[in-house]
Design a protein with these regions (language model features):
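Long, low-complexity intrinsically disordered regions
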Residues: 13-16, 89-100
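Short aromatic-glycine-enriched beta-strand elements
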Residues: 57-64
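A short macromolecule-binding patch
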Residues: 70-79
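Preference for intrinsically disordered or flexible, low-complexity segments
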Residues: 1-2, 6, 82-85, 98-100
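A short beta-strand micro-motif
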Residues: 39-43
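Mixed-charge, Lys/Arg-rich low-complexity intrinsically disordered regions
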Residues: 1-38
């Protein structure tokens, strides 16, 4: 996506937000509403299933990853996306762009 497209998505996610906490909540909402779950990706060379998205107490956005009976939260800014990425992954890219 282009810088302009990412900026437009960021603007859409944060349009009614007054501070960084509300902006993070806006991105969380857009990711939850648009990202097609579950999907499989590779984290540290291991295939995991991304099952859900959560907002941490520090307002970072987390992906709930599972393999077998083990679950681990991974910050979406650190989450490798598969090729092709799932529908709605542009919101993760916009969040990464917004964070700088």
């Amino acid at each position: 996506m282009s810088e302009a497209e990412l900026a437009a998505l960021a603007g859409e996610a944060t349009v009614d937000a007054y501070d960084e906490d509300e902006q993070a909540m806006g991105f969380h909402t857009m990711i939850v509403d648009n990202l097609e779950l579950p999907f499989v990706t590779s984290v540290l060379g291991v295939d995991v299933t991304v099952e859900d998205i959560d907002l941490a107490e520090d307002n970072s956005i987390l992906a709930g990853c599972a393999r077998g009976g083990v679950r681990q939260a991974v910050r979406v800014v650190d989450l490798p996306l598969p090729e092709p990425p799932p529908a709605g992954a542009e919101w993760i890219e916009a969040y990464r762009h917004w964070l700088g």
